[in-house]
């Protein structure tokens, strides 16, 4: 799984995920599924924001990289991808500027067009189940929730999907590609099922002839790994570094 992640995701995303796991003492060589999940969530957040701007009339527009209008204001403020201190600083600034209610938990994005925070979810399970879990945790009508699955399904608060159909299709296609590439490498079942992940981990450890004292237990504790990424101020140039992430994963 680790090799797959390094091949499939943009190096910047991989580096951010590595730092996140290291900060919380999580070994990416053991918790490879979490490593893949963090990278996937980061990429979806970036793809959600990329190419979306607000013009001088306050209208939301989609702009490609080579368009001179790329200096326009980004429609979305990316909160995910920053360390906690920086992230809360951004949230507080947004609240002070827009009058938005401060969320209890760090959201992933802020939508300047619809003036609301957004929580992005990527699930390997049923979208409605994950949506309800998110809603029960957040317990706020002021944070918009948008859930994507690896099967092309999605669910959003009040069926308001925020983005245009083409932008959402791009995200769904990327997630489906990740699933297919995992399946081609025999990784998908273990990514979905903790029991299968444990079996795969033991198999990998045995094949690599690692030391006998290395833990083989798959940890399933909940952490804030997604919230402690390094500061990464997003500007109009960020899409250049991320564009490679949108390409299909290289075949084995």
Swiss-Prot record:
The keyword Cytoplasm does not apply. It comes from the Viruses. The active site is at residues 80, 108. Pfam families: Flu_PA. GO terms for biological process: viral RNA genome replication; viral translational frameshifting. The keyword Transmembrane helix does not apply. One of its GO terms (molecular function) is RNA binding. The record marks 28, 65, 202-203, 206 as: Important for efficient shutoff activity. Keywords: Decay of host mRNAs by virus, Eukaryotic host gene expression shutoff by virus, Host cytoplasm, Host gene expression shutoff by virus, Host mRNA suppression by virus, Host nucleus, Host-virus interaction. It is found in: Host cytoplasm; Host nucleus. Its main location: host cell. The record marks 195, 198-199 as: Important for efficient shutoff activity and nuclear localization. InterPro entries: PA/PA-X, PA/PA-X_sf. Belongs to the influenza viruses PA-X family. Plays a major role in the shutoff of the host protein expression by cleaving mRNAs probably via an endonuclease activity. This host shutoff allows the virus to escape from the host antiviral response. Hijacks host RNA splicing machinery to selectively target host RNAs containing introns for destruction. This may explain the preferential degradation of RNAs that have undergone co- or post-transcriptional processing. The probable endonuclease active site in the N-terminus and the basic amino acid cluster in the C-terminus are important for the shutoff activity. The C-terminus acts as a nuclear localization signal. The C-terminus is recruited to host protein complexes involved in nuclear Pol II RNA processing. This is Protein PA-X. It comes from Influenza A virus (strain A/Swine/Colorado/1/1977 H3N2).
